[in-house]
C-alpha cells in the first residue's frame, strides 16, 4: 500500500511539474501587404528583465515561430524586423493553462513609412574569418584607393602579387578562382585581363579559402579566391554613376567611367553594371631600363638595354548582370551574366640590347635590336543559371547550377630583329654593322570553352548534425592556333617549323559527401568529408601529329575540428588534400622562339601536383586571428629557365636559354600568420597582418640535385579614418622579403597606397584622390642551375595617381530578402532550444 501511495505521489508530482511548461507560437506578417515576414527576430524576456533574454528564435519562411518547453512565469515577447516598428506583448503567467500551448495567432508589424525616409546604418566588417574562409569586404573607401579590381586584389591579406604580376596565396602558387561561387577555368593571364577591365566599385569582396571543404573543386593547391560581385541590397530602384582618372607620368594615363542600376521588390533582386576603360602606357627611351648577366661555365655575358622604349594603347568594356526570382516561399531561380572586351589596337616596343663579355662589360662586341608592333583583342562571356528548393522547415535544400563560359583572344604581331657586330668601339656606332636580320609576322588565336553542371543537397539532421552531398561534371576545351611567317627577300612566307596548332580537352566528374556534428553543448564541432574526382584529358599537337591522353582518379579527404572556449574564442584544426592540374599550354611540346637568345616550350609528360595542407588557427574576440600552416607538395609544377643544349633539333646561339615546366620533386612550406582587425575608435579602423614563411625545395634535375631553403617575412597595414565634415583618409602598406622558387630567387618588394576622400549631399556625391606606389627602385631576380647563373634588374614603375567621382541615386533601404540568416545561424536559433 505504501508503494502504491509513493508511486501515485510521484506521478502527481511529475504531472504537476510538466504542467508548468508549454509551447508559445505565432505568425509574423506585414500589416500592409499581408505577407509573411521570414527570419524576423523573436525574443522572449523575463518581465523583470533581470536575466535579460530568455529565448530567441527566427520566424520561418511562412512567418511562423515557436518557443518550446517554456516555464510558467511573467514574460515579454519582442519581435524586430528591419524597416518595421518594434512589437512588444506581455504574456502573464496566468496565460499558462495545463496541457495547452499558447497560440498568439497572427501578429501584424507596422511598416515605418516611405522608403526614402528610412535610413539604415551599419558598419560592415572589412575582415571576417569563419570556418573555411577569410572575407575582405570592399566598401567605398577601399574601392576608391585603386583604379581597377586587379589592384584591389593586392590589398587582400595573404595575397602576394609581385612586380612581375605573378600571384601567390599564403606563400604558394597554384591559385584557383571563382566569381560569386562559380568556378573560373581560366589561366591567370586571362583573369588578370578580366580584373583590370573591371571597376573596383563592381566588387563586393574577396573570399580567401585556404582550406576549402569537399563541396568545392579540388583544383588549387594554394586555395581558392572567390571574386564576389556586388548584388543589390536595397528595396526599390537605385544605382550610381562615376568616373575615375589615373595618371602615372606623361606616358601612362587613362580614364574609367562606370554605372550601376539595381532593383528589388518582394519577388525580384536585379543588379547590373557597366564600365569602360581606356589606357595609354609607355616608357620613354632610357638607358639601363633592364640589365641581365649570364654566367655559363667560365664565360660571363652582359645584356644591357640602352634605350628601351614602349608605347601602347588599350581599352575595354565590362558588363555584369544578376537576377534572382522567388518562385514561392521555398524556391528561388537565379541568373547571372558577365561579358567583357579588352582590345589593344596599337602597341610599339623598341628594345636595343648591347652584348659584352667579361672583363670588358662596357665595351660591347655585339648587339641586337628588336622592334615589334602588336594588335590584340579578347572577349569573355560567362553565364550561370541556378535553382534552390527548400525541402522542409529545418532548411533542408537542394540546389542545381548550370554554368557556361568562353574566352576568345587574337593577337597579331610584327617583329623585326637586327643583329650587329662591334665596329667602332663606342655605343653610338655599335649598331652600324648589321650581319643578319630576321622578320616575323605572327598570329596567335586562342579559344577556350567550359560548361559544368552540379547538384548539391543539404540536410540538417538535427540541431547538432548536418549532412551535405553532391556531384558535378565539367567539360573544358581549348584550341590554340599559332601561325608564323618569316620575312624572305622582302616577302613574308609561311614558316611551318614555327607554326603550331594545339587542341586540348578535359573532363572532370566528381562526387562528394560531408558530415558535420557538434558535441558538448555545441562547443566541439567535427566535420569530415571526402571528394572523388575522375579526370580524362586529351591533347593533340597538329604539327608533330602527336596525341597525349591521361586518365586518373583521385580522392580528396577533408577534416575540420574546432572548439569554442567561448563564443568569441575558438581554436580549429584543418586538413585537406588538393590538386593542381597542368594548364593546356604547359603540356604543348611546341618550341616557341622569341629571339636567338630566348625560347620556351611545354612538357607533355607533366603530372598533376598534389598538396597536403594542415592548419591550426585561433580567433580571439573576432579581433585577433592566428594560424600556423604546413603544406607538403609532391610533383610541384615550376617553370625552369636553363641553357639550351644540343638535344633540340635546331641551331641556336650558345647563349640561348629555354623556359619550360617540370615536376620538380617535392616542397615543404611552413607559415605563421597573425592578423589584427579592429575599430580602435569609432572613426578609426586598423587591420594589420604579418608573419614568417619557410620553404624547402628538393628536386632531381638532369644535371643537378636541388636542395634549397628560404625564409621570408611579410607584413601589411590597412587603416581607415573618418574625419569631421565627412572627410576620410585611408592607407595601405605591404612588404614582402625575398622569395625563392626552386632555382630562382627574387628580391623583396613594397607597395604603398593612400587615399583621401570627401562626401557631399548626404553621401550621394563622393570625391576621392589616391596614390599607388611600388617603392622598389629596381626589381631583381636570380636563377642558378648547373654552371649557369642568370641575374636580371628592371626599373620599377613610378607612382600612379587616381581621381574618382561617384554619384548615388534612388532609394536606399535594406530589403527583407537580404536579411535572411545563413543556414548555420538559422539552424542554431530555430526552435529556441530547451531549458
Please state what every model-predicted region is.
Residues 48-64:
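Short, acidic Ser/Thr/Gly-rich low-complexity loop/linker segments typical of extracellular
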Residues 228-245, 284, 288-289, 305, ...:
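Surface-exposed extracellular loop regions of Gram-negative outer-membrane beta-barrel proteins
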Residues 500-505, 579-634, 657-670, 792, ...:
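Outer-membrane beta-barrel signature, preferentially recognizing the C-terminal barrel domain
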Residues 150-187:
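Extracytoplasmic beta-strand/coil segments of soluble accessory domains associated
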Residues 149, 155, 182-210:
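Short acidic/polar hinge/loop motifs at secondary-structure boundaries
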Amino acid at each position: 500500500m505504501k508503494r502504491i501511495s509513493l508511486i501515485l505521489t510521484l506521478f502527481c508530482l511529475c504531472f504537476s511539474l510538466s504542467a508548468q511548461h508549454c509551447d508559445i507560437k505565432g505568425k509574423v506578417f506585414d500589416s500592409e501587404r499581408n505577407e509573411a515576414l521570414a527570419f524576423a527576430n523573436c525574443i522572449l524576456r523575463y518581465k523583470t528583465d533581470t536575466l535579460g533574454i530568455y529565448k530567441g528564435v527566427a520566424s520561418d519562411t511562412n512567418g511562423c515561430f515557436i518557443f518550446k518547453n517554456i516555464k510558467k512565469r511573467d514574460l515579454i515577447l519582442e519581435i524586430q524586423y528591419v524597416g518595421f516598428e518594434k512589437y512588444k506583448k506581455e504574456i502573464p503567467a496566468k496565460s499558462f493553462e495545463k496541457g495547452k500551448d499558447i497560440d498568439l495567432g497572427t501578429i501584424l508589424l507596422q511598416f515605418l513609412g516611405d522608403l526614402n525616409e528610412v535610413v539604415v546604418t551599419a558598419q560592415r566588417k572589412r575582415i571576417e574569418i569563419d570556418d573555411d574562409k577569410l572575407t575582405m569586404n570592399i566598401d567605398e573607401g577601399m574601392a576608391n584607393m585603386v583604379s581597377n579590381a586587379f589592384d584591389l586584389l593586392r590589398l587582400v591579406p595573404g595575397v602576394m602579387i609581385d612586380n612581375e604580376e605573378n600571384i601567390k596565396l599564403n606563400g604558394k602558387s597554384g591559385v584557383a578562382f571563382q566569381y560569386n561561387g562559380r568556378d573560373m577555368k581560366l589561366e591567370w593571364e586571362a583573369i588578370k585581363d578580366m580584373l583590370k577591365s573591371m571597376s573596383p566599385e563592381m566588387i563586393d569582396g574577396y573570399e580567401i579559402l585556404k582550406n576549402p571543404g569537399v563541396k568545392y573543386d579540388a583544383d588549387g593547391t594554394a586555395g581558392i579566391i572567390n571574386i564576389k560581385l556586388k548584388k543589390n541590397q536595397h528595396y526599390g530602384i537605385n544605382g550610381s554613376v562615376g568616373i575615375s582618372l589615373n595618371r602615372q607620368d606623361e606616358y601612362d594615363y587613362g580614364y574609367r567611367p562606370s554605372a550601376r542600376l539595381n532593383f528589388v521588390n518582394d519577388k525580384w533582386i536585379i543588379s547590373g553594371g557597366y564600365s569602360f576603360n581606356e589606357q595609354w602606357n609607355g616608357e620613354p627611351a632610357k638607358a639601363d631600363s633592364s640589365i641581365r648577366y649570364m654566367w655559363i661555365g667560365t664565360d660571363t655575358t652582359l645584356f644591357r638595354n640602352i634605350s628601351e622604349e614602349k608605347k601602347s594603347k588599350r581599352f575595354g568594356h565590362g558588363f555584369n548582370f544578376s537576377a534572382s526570382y522567388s518562385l514561392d516561399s521555398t524556391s528561388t531561380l537565379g541568373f547571372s551574366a558577365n561579358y567583357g572586351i579588352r582590345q589593344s589596337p596599337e602597341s610599339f616596343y623598341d628594345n636595343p640590347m648591347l652584348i659584352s663579355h667579361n672583363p670588358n662589360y662596357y665595351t660591347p662586341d655585339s648587339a641586337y635590336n628588336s622592334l615589334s608592333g602588336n594588335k590584340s583583342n579578347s572577349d569573355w562571356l560567362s553565364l550561370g543559371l541556378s535553382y534552390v528548393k527548400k525541402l522542409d522547415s529545418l532548411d533542408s535544400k537542394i540546389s542545381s547550377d548550370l554554368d557556361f563560359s568562353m574566352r576568345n583572344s587574337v593577337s597579331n604581331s610584327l617583329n623585326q630583329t637586327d643583329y650587329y657586330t662591334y665596329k667602332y668601339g663606342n655605343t653610338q656606332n655599335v649598331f652600324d654593322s648589321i650581319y643578319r636580320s630576321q622578320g616575323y609576322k605572327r598570329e596567335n588565336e586562342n579559344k577556350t570553352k567550359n560548361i559544368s553542371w552540379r547538384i548539391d543537397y543539404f540536410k540538417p539532421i538535427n540541431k547538432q548534425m548536418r549532412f551535405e552531398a553532391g556531384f558535378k561534371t565539367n567539360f573544358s576545351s581549348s584550341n590554340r592556333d599559332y601561325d608564323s611567317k618569316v620575312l624572305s627577300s622582302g616577302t613574308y612566307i609561311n614558316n611551318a617549323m614555327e607554326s603550331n596548332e594545339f587542341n586540348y580537352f578535359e573532363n572532370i566528374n566528381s562526387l562528394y559527401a560531408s558530415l558535420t556534428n557538434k558535441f558538448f553543448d555545441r562547443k566541439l564541432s567535427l566535420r569530415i568529408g571526402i571528394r572523388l574526382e575522375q579526370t580524362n584529358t586529351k591533347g593533340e599537337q597538329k604539327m608533330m601529329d602527336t596525341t597525349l591522353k591521361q586518365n586518373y582518379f583521385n580522392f580528396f579527404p577533408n577534416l575540420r575540428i574546432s572548439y569554442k572556449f567561448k563564443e568569441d574564442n575558438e581554436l580549429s584544426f584543418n586538413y585537406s588534400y588538393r590538386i593542381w592540374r597542368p594548364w593546356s599550354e604547359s603540356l604543348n611540346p611546341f618550341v616557341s622562339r622569341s629571339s636567338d637568345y630566348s625560347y620556351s616550350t611545354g612538357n607533355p609528360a607533366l603530372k598533376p601536383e598534389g598538396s597536403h595542407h594542415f592548419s591550426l588557427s585561433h580567433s580571439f574576440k573576432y579581433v585577433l586571428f592566428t594560424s600556423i600552416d604546413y603544406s607538403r607538395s609532391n610533383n610541384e609544377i615550376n617553370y625552369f629557365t636553363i641553357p639550351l643544349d644540343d638535344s633540340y633539333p635546331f641551331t641556336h646561339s650558345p647563349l640561348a636559354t629555354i623556359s619550360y615546366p617540370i615536376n620538380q620533386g617535392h616542397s615543404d612550406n611552413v607559415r605563421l600568420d597573425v592578423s589584427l582587425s579592429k575599430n580602435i575608435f569609432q572613426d578609426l579602423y586598423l587591420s594589420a597582418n604579418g608573419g614568417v614563411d619557410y620553404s624547402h625545395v628538393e628536386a632531381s634535375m638532369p644535371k643537378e640535385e636541388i636542395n634549397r631553403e628560404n625564409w621570408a617575412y611579410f607584413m601589411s597595414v590597412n587603416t581607415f579614418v573618418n574625419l569631421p565634415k565627412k572627410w576620410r583618409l585611408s592607407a595601405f602598406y605591404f612588404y614582402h622579403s625575398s622569395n625563392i622558387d626552386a632555382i630562382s630567387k627574387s628580391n623583396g618588394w613594397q607597395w604603398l597606397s593612400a587615399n583621401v576622400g570627401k562626401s557631399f549631399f548626404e553621401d550621394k556625391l563622393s570625391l576621392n584622390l589616391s596614390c599607388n606606389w611600388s617603392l622598389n627602385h629596381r626589381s631583381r631576380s636570380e636563377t642558378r642551375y648547373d654552371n649557369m647563373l642568370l641575374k636580371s634588374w628592371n626599373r620599377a614603375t613610378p607612382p600612379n595617381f587616381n581621381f574618382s567621382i561617384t554619384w548615388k541615386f534612388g532609394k536606399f533601404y535594406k530589403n527583407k530578402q537580404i536579411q535572411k540568416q545563413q543556414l548555420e545561424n538559422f539552424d542554431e536559433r530555430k526552435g529556441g532550444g530547451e531549458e
